[in-house]
């Protein structure tokens, strides 16, 4: 799921997660920055495989906010490994404020970016959440400001 900030990516992903829970699926919600921190800490403590196994028990993982921070090589490799283990086996929702063509800005390496995009998009539904920020629109409305005059 890609799109500008405030277009409903997280809201939609959480809604899908709730629906999956209601149908008996095991769901985990996390942010990409938090996931990367956890992976790096597990790796430094020689407990990476134990941490990775934790993800295998979830039918759906929602990984929110890809694109707000860049990764060093270790983080990119660790994230690639976790996502690769799930590819074509279990469901994963990734939300990002960047389109795929800009993901090399996050990962800093064209080869790993290409591999991650390839694995994530295989048999995937791609959703582009176009539009303006719902949060900004609501804030302006609450302040009595016309959204159209601010964004022009």
Model-based region annotation:
Residues 5:
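The conserved Walker
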Residues 9:
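Conserved lysine of the Walker
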Residues 17-30, 40:
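Post-Walker A helix-loop "phosphate-sensing" segment adjacent to the P-loop in P-loop NTPases
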Residues 25, 50-59:
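Short basic/glycine-enriched coil/helix segment immediately N-terminal to the Walker B
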Residues 12, 16:
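Hydrophobic positions on the alpha1 helix immediately C-terminal to the Walker A/P-loop
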């Amino acid at each position: 799921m890609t799109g500008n900030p405030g277009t409903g990516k997280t809201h939609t992903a959480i809604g899908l997660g709730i629906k999956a829970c209601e149908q008996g699926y095991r769901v985990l919600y996390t942010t990409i920055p938090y996931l990367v921190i956890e992976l790096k800490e597990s790796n430094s403590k020689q407990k990476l495989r134990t941490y990775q196994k934790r993800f295998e028990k979830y039918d759906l993982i929602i990984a929110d906010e890809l694109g707000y921070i860049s990764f060093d090589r270790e983080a990119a490799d660790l994230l690639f490994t976790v996502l690769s283990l799930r590819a074509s086996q279990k469901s994963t929702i990734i939300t990002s404020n960047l389109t795929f063509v800009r993901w090399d800005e996050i990962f800093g390496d064209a080869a790993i970016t290409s591999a991650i995009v390839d694995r994530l998009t295989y048999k995937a539904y791609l959703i582009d959440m176009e539009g303006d920020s719902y949060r900004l629109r609501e804030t302006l409305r609450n302040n009595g400001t016309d959204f159209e005059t601010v964004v022009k």
